[in-house]
Structure formats: structure tokens, C-alpha cells
A protein has these predicted regions:
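Glycine- and acidic-residue-biased ligand/ion/polar-headgroup-sensing regions
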Residues: 1-6, 11, 22-23
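A short, polar/charged loop-to-alpha-helix boundary motif
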Residues: 14-17, 135
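Cyclic-nucleotide recognition modules
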Residues: 16-74
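Alpha-helical bundle regulatory/interaction domains
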Residues: 64, 68, 72-83, 91-92, ...
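Phosphate-/nucleic-acid-contacting segments
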Residues: 93-140
Length: 140
């Protein structure tokens, strides 16, 4: 299945942060490790199978299966790089460039997600996303 993590602003508008699909994982890293309430929400966008683990159980596995600890560190670093790149793109890229980056990062989700979800991730309206898609399709 597919998930989204999102926050809701003061006006009640939802803003998607990342998506996660089959074989991926998604969680509020700050909330999980600091054991504090989450500032974000996670929603399944499709029928999904969820595997969850308690913090103490994950820490136990880290201590007792060193290879697992290394795998989680590598995955966490990869997710951090993705988030860092997204921040850089939001600051310095056009909406079309951000959409092309989305297609590269989430190639299997572009046809599975509604325009509203993708537009929220890109920080644009669904109508503007449709315009971008038309421009790309026409080769402009």
C-alpha cells in the first residue's frame, strides 16, 4: 500500500511531507525517539499491511543484532538525504523541477496518487499540477 505523512497548518490545510510505498517505512523520527507526541499524522492512502515496533523492542534489536543496527542507520541516512534534498528543492527549484524530482523519487506513485496529494507534496494547487503535466506532455 501507500502512506503519507502530513502536517496541518493553522488554517486547517494539510501539507504532505513524504510518501512511503511497499517495502518502505515511515514514522515520525523525533516523536519515536524522544517519546513525545507527534506533530504529524500518517495516513494509509491504499489498503496496506502495517508492521509496527515499540521503541524498546527496536533498541533491543539494535543492541543484539549489529547488522540490523547498521541497516537502520543506512536507511535513516538515506531518508535524511531525501528530506534535505527536498528542502533545497523547495527553496531553489521551480514547481516543474520539483514535480520531475517527485517522479524520480517516487516513480511508482505518480499514477497511484490523486493530484491533490501530489500537489500538496509539491506545495502547489492541483490545477497548477495539471498545467505542469500538460507542459511536460507537450514537450515545453
Amino acid at each position: 500500500g501507500c502512506f503519507r505523512m502530513y502536517i496541518t497548518d493553522a488554517e486547517g490545510k494539510e501539507h504532505n511531507i513524504p510518501f512511503a510505498a511497499e517495502g518502505d517505512w515511515i514514522y515520525d523520527i523525533d516523536s519515536f525517539h524522544a517519546t513525545t507526541p507527534s506533530q504529524s499524522n500518517i495516513q494509509a492512502l491504499e489498503a496496506s499491511e502495517v508492521i509496527q515496533i515499540a521503541q524498546k523492542d527496536l533498541y533491543y534489536l539494535y543492541l543484539n543484532i549489529l547488522k540490523l543496527d547498521r541497516i537502520f542507520k543506512v536507511v535513516t541516512e538515506e531518508k535524511y538525504v531525501e528530506l534535505q534534498n527536498r528542502v533545497f528543492q523547495n527553496i531553489s527549484s521551480t514547481a516543474q523541477q520539483r514535480y520531475l524530482s517527485f517522479l524520480k523519487q517516487y516513480p511508482n506513485l505518480a499514477n497511484r496518487l490523486p493530484n491533490t496529494q501530489i500537489a500538496s507534496y509539491l506545495g502547489i494547487t492541483p490545477e497548477f499540477l495539471s498545467m505542469i503535466r500538460k507542459e511536460i506532455a507537450s514537450g515545453q
